Amino acid sequence: MAGHSHWAQIKHKKAKVDAQKGKLFGKLIREITVATKLGGPDPNANPRLRIAIEAARKVSMPMDTIEKAIKRGTGNDKEGALEEIVYEGYGPGGTAIMVVVATDNRNKATSEVRHAFSKHGGNLGSSGCVSYLFEQKGVIEIPKEATDEEKLMEAALEAGADDVESTEDMFIVYTNPKDVYTIKDILASKGFTIESAKTSLIPTTTVEIKDVDTAKKLLNLLEHLDELDEVQEVISNFEIDKDILAALG
């Protein structure tokens, strides 16, 4: 699961910049809308929506903004309906990339994603071209600060988690997708601080990037994709040695 971890570490380092740009608000609004569309407007009956609302409140999103996003998800809104699309493609170094988009304009989204791939030495592929290299997992992120790894490991496995992984500043708890929100609630009830909880695509195998130039091209592509307005998540199956990451600054 190193591909997820490396990009997650890089993403956490730029998270504050995203928040300043207002991009985080946009992502959360779209997540609330899509979650409502797929699972209904009642957060008590729709765990994905409940988690999205919790994340929005955590960054002080106004309640009327949240309610408007829910309304759009039910279709009782004048704005166009959002749909969730997953694009698949190839990146530098033979890497596989999945891009999750929430959009009301499929043609525009496809054009923007294709342009990003082409600009940075990648190729947008057809549906199914790389998805077999990933599996759906529940992903719970817990800040390392003030978290006892042994206690977390014990509590997570007891709650039914598959594995716990350590990154630079986070513990990542992996679960069966259908259990992620239940396990998140169990861990929260035991006093663990939850940074985020969601379902995500996780690589089953990784591709090692062995040179600085390829690593730079790949990370530029992933960052370009992630900065597109309608992109919700970018997942890749790369693994980069820490010395190469250090050389990139």
UniProtKB/Swiss-Prot annotation:
Positions of transmembrane segments: none
Compartment(s) of residence: Cytoplasm
InterPro entries to which the protein is assigned, alphabetical: Integrase-like_N, TACO1_YebC-like_2nd/3rd_dom, TACO1_YebC_N, Transcrip_reg_TACO1-like, Transcrip_reg_TACO1-like_dom3, YebC-like
GO molecular function: DNA binding
GO CC, any one term: cytosol
Keywords: Cytoplasm, DNA-binding, Transcription, Transcription regulation
This protein's record includes keyword rRNA-binding: no
Protein's UniProt keywords contain Transcription regulation: yes
Gene Ontology process terms (BP): regulation of DNA-templated transcription
Family the entry assigns: Belongs to the TACO1 family.
Database matches in PANTHER family: TRANSCRIPTIONAL REGULATORY PROTEIN YEBC-RELATED (PTHR12532:SF6), TRANSLATIONAL ACTIVATOR OF CYTOCHROME C OXIDASE 1 (PTHR12532)
Protein name: Probable transcriptional regulatory protein HY04AAS1_0501
